[in-house]
Amino acid sequence: MLLKSIQNIVCGLVPTFFLFGSAAAELDFEQWHPAGLGDLRCGCPAMNSLANHGFINHNGSNITVNEVIPLMQEVFHLSEELATIVTGLAVLSADDPASGIFNLDMLNRHNIFEHDASLTRKDFYLGGDGHTIDQPTLDEFLSYFDGKEWIDLNDAAAARYARVLDSREKNPSFLYQDQQLITSYGETIKYFRTMVDPRSNKTSAEFVRILFTEERLPVREGWQRPREEISGFSLASDVVQLALRTPEKFIGMPFDQRPFAEQAFDPLPWQRPPIWTPPNYPGFSKRHFSELVGRFAKKALPFRA
């Protein structure tokens, strides 16, 4: 349903994007100015970096689908299909998605583009606003790369999952179902792949630090546009690899369903069986059954997320 909404909105807007042409030769990465008073920003460092470099309106307002899609292709080497999906998710946060126009601060609306367990922002419940970098959160995220010149997918997985655990512990309204889970995995893969060295399949820790702290593309330090196109298929494949490096047993599962061992054993949401309702025996309630199975699951599972 979500992808269908994106398709319906964006397909009517993208024909004119071909008029944009190839912008790579015209983009001046040396031009960079951080957000000033009154400038609008969101929780996505990639989007914010486009504004800080002046590739989209520096004030963060009146951004169009027709300009963002080709920029995603030219700057980050996303495929047309993936650039359209990412931009479509952004425009869904707009007051009028069908217009194809949005402001960056609209992306801060909770649980559309923005989500709990951000890599650098506080959860809304904990006082976050979606766009302001929270220094303790940023420090925790970057601490997983301390002392390393290069980071691999294991490092990226550990840093991401630490944020999930932290939010789960501190935020009683923490929401981490399939939409938030896929968004969380996807954003980690996107920064990892756009900064990766194809020879080693590792990413410069310095590039990641600059992107997340300054919201700047680290061209001065040697970053270049990825050589290989990042497609929806390659993103999905990398998401699976990231998931396999993450000790989540209840990934994407609503908390009230987690006592059931049948679902607890499934590591990924697309491998989950349908929700099973236990038999209704007189004097033996669903709560009793849940407690019984929960005790069994605790003994049967060596660890649980």
UniProtKB/Swiss-Prot annotation:
The residues listed in the UniProt record as binding Mn(2+), with positions renumbered to this chain, are: E114, H115, S118
Claim: Metal-binding is one of the keywords in the record: yes
Q: How is the cofactor bound?
A: Binds 1 heme b (iron(II)-protoporphyrin IX) group per subunit. Binds 1 Mn(2+) ion per subunit.
Q: In which pathway does it act?
A: Mycotoxin biosynthesis; sterigmatocystin biosynthesis
SS bonds (residue pairs) = none
| Signal peptide start and end residues | 1-25
What does the entry say induces or represses the expression of this protein?
The genes forming the sterigmatocystin biosynthesis cluster are co-regulated and induced on oatmeal porridge or the fungal isolates were grown either on oatmeal porridge or in YEC medium (0.2% yeast extract, 5.0% corn steep liquor). Expression is positively regulated by the cluster-specific transcription factor aflR that binds the palindromic sequence 5'-TCG(N5)CGA-3'found in the promoter.
Q: Which family does it belong to?
A: Belongs to the chloroperoxidase family.
- Physiological role: Peroxidase; part of the gene cluster that mediates the biosynthesis of sterigmatocystin (ST), a polyketide-derived furanocoumarin which is part of the most toxic and carcinogenic compounds among the known mycotoxins. The first step in the biosynthesis of sterigmatocystin is the production of hexanoate by the fatty acid synthase (FAS) units stcJ and stcK. The polyketide backbone is assembled by the non-reducing polyketide synthase stcA by condensation of the starter hexanoyl-CoA and 7 malonyl-CoA extender units followed by cyclization and release of norsolorinic acid.
- Report the PANTHER family cross-referenced here: PEROXIDASE STCC, STERIGMATOCYSTIN BIOSYNTHESIS PEROXIDASE STCC-RELATED
Q: What is this protein called?
A: Peroxidase stcC
